[in-house]
Regions:
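Residues that flank catalytic or metal-binding motifs in active/ligand-binding sites
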Residues: 4-6, 32, 82, 101
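Active-site-adjacent beta-strand/loop module that shapes the phosphate/pyrophosphate-binding cleft
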Residues: 3-4, 14-16, 72-96, 106, ...
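Short secondary-structure boundary/capping segments
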Residues: 10, 25-26, 76, 96-99
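A short coil-to-beta-strand element that immediately follows conserved catalytic motifs
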Residues: 62-71
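Conserved N-terminal beta-strand and adjoining loop/helix that marks the start
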Residues: 1-19, 37-40
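Conserved Nudix-box catalytic region and its N-terminal flanking loop in Nudix hydrolases
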Residues: 17-57
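Nudix hydrolase/Nudix homology domain
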Residues: 27, 31, 98-134
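Short histidine/acidic/glycine/proline-rich micro-motifs that form metal-
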Residues: 40-42, 75-76, 112-114
Length: 134
């Protein structure tokens, strides 16, 4: 299978917040911007396995396949790769997670998430999430 991107976010339905990742300035792709946790597939992974691995690497937490909800998937023409986006319902506190990559991460209220410096694909996919939630 060709390399693909798999990523996503945690969502707390009680507080209506999403957990997003702030990229550091060492990356060539969207430095210092907020986006989803995730990355490129490795070996023979399927998308959900890539998402689980990336969350483990970036937040230090384990997800079960059954907790993961597919949001959307499509061809990212700009990068010529398929993009799979997932989310997980969670009320985990920030203190229970450990940043493994990037500059920061935080719970952000949906009411003002679009005031953050988000990557273009994060904006598009969060809009899809909001359309499906309402």
């Amino acid at each position: 299978m060709k390399t693909f991107f798999a990523g996503g976010f945690l969502y707390n339905p009680k507080t209506k917040e999403v957990l997003l990742h702030k990229r550091d300035d060492k990356t060539d792709v969207n430095p210092n911007m907020w986006g989803f946790f995730g990355g490129s597939s490795e070996n023979d992974e399927i998308p959900i396995q890539t998402f689980i691995r990336e969350i483990r690497e970036e937040l230090g937490i384990e997800l079960s396949e059954g907790s993961i909800i597919p949001l959307c998937d499509y061809l990212n023409v700009k990068r010529d790769t398929h993009r799979y986006v997932f989310y997980v319902l969670s009320n985990k506190k920030k203190e229970e997670m450990v940043l493994g990559e990037g500059a920061d991460f935080d719970w952000i209220p949906l009411a003002n998430v679009f005031s953050y410096d988000l990557t273009t694909k994060t904006v598009d996919d969060l809009r899809t999430f909001l359309e499906k939630k309402t």
